[in-house]
Design a protein with these regions (language model features):
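HotDog/MaoC-like acyl-thioester-processing domains
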Residues: 1-2, 90-146
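Low-complexity, intrinsically disordered segments exposed to solvent
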Residues: 84, 88-90
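Hot-dog-fold acyl-thioester-processing enzymes
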Residues: 1-84
Length: 146
């Protein structure tokens, strides 16, 4: 079980510079078909004037912040017993090639559900101070409430 004093703990900003090659790799790996994400001519003619990252690219620029929480020694999470529960995102603005994305995190909750520990992390990602994506990650530590 996580000591309740850690609920609300914050994780400092991590920086991710969005590269066109990383967007292309993500598009190819996921089979993204949105022309604003994978067709340069369509993207240039579109509302953003260039290729934008697919919304779920958020997992790429948020991963270091999520990792900081998962591997936080103070929380003493039992990693071999941890599984991904779910994730939710709110997309506020598109992320584009060249953007410097800064993501922060906050341990939202840690609660016992039967014998398991359910841990939630909230994230906020910003470009030039403007919120682009918020996320909620939920993890389950099997047997972690015992």
């Amino acid at each position: 079980m996580i000591d309740p004093k850690f609920i609300g703990k914050t994780y400092p900003p991590t920086k991710y510079i969005v590269g066109i090659e990383k967007i292309k790799e993500y598009v190819n790996a996921t089979g993204e078909k949105n022309p604003l994400c994978c067709n340069e001519a369509a993207a240039k003619a579109g509302p953003y004037g260039q290729i934008v990252a697919p919304p779920m690219f958020a997992v790429v620029y948020m991963k270091e912040t999520v990792g900081a929480m998962l591997f936080d020694r103070e929380l003493q999470l039992n990693m071999p017993m941890l599984v991904h529960g779910e994730q939710e995102f709110l997309f506020h603005k598109p992320v584009k090639h060249g953007d410097e994305v800064f993501t922060t995190g906050r341990l939202k909750s840690a609660e016992a559900r039967k014998q398991n520990l359910v841990v939630s992390l909230e994230t906020e990602s910003r470009v030039n101070g403007e919120l682009v994506t918020t996320g909620l990650y939920t993890f389950v530590v099997r047997g972690g409430a015992l």
